[in-house]
Design a protein with these regions (language model features):
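Conserved phosphate/oxyanion-binding catalytic-loop motifs
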Residues: 2
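Metal-dependent amide/peptide-bond hydrolase catalytic core
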Residues: 22-199
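Short, solvent-exposed loop/turn segments at secondary-structure boundaries
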Residues: 13-16, 81
Length: 199
């Protein structure tokens, strides 16, 4: 979270204020430049500000703005320095515009990186259970996953078993219809993976 601390006042007297809303918009724009100008362009990275709250009336310059967002990357080094990079940008923009700030960064999940050898075992076992035409390798995604903490300590593979119904609402939707009968395929796949890895 980023809290911009400005000086509020009447909209007709902006010269007597430090407009936290304006400072916040500059912060949002500057944060996007971390990805476009400070990270290798062949390395996927995301900085998203998903929440921005400032002001309570059309004719009052707000003294405070609150921004919240998230960062994502597949690179462990980039993941470990997000906080310092973000705060440096916030401090620079706020300093240039005469505002103060409060900065709080929650690190969240590290990148989820599968072990190639274990992933091969999972793929082979899944094919033996559901057939090659039903096993797909999805595109990389920036979604966070707590499995990443396990994969940092032990070689493994994060994989998903489709349990949606044709034409039904997707996962993370209040109308999602979980196909319980497909859990048996997941159990069989897990069992075969365990037997294969245990030799």
């Amino acid at each position: 979270d980023i809290r911009i601390l400005g000086k509020g006042g009447h909209a007709a007297q902006p010269h007597l204020c430090v407009d936290a809303l304006e400072v916040g918009t500059q912060v949002v724009a500057a944060l996007q430049r971390i990805v476009s100008r400070q990270i290798n362009p062949i390395e996927p990275a995301v900085v998203t500000v998903g929440s921005f709250h400032a002001g309570t009336a059309f004719n009052i310059i707000p003294a405070e703005a609150v921004l919240s967002g998230t960062t994502r990357t597949f690179n462990e080094e980039t993941w470990s320095v997000w906080a310092s990079r973000l705060e440096k940008v916030v401090a620079g923009v706020c300093g240039a515009m005469g505002a103060g700030y409060e900065f709080q960064f929650s690190r969240g999940y590290p990148p989820t990186v599968n072990d190639a050898a274990v992933a091969d075992v999972v793929r082979r076992c899944a094919i033996s259970v559901v057939g090659e035409d039903r096993v797909v390798e999805p595109e990389l995604t920036m979604g966070g996953e707590d499995m990443s903490f396990f994969l940092k300590r032990v070689p493994g593979c994060f994989y998903c078993i489709g349990v949606g119904r044709e034409g039904a609402a997707p996962l993370h939707n209040p109308r999602f219809d979980f196909a319980e009968e497909l859990m048996l395929l997941g159990v069989e796949t897990h069992g075969r993976v365990a037997m294969d890895l245990l030799g």
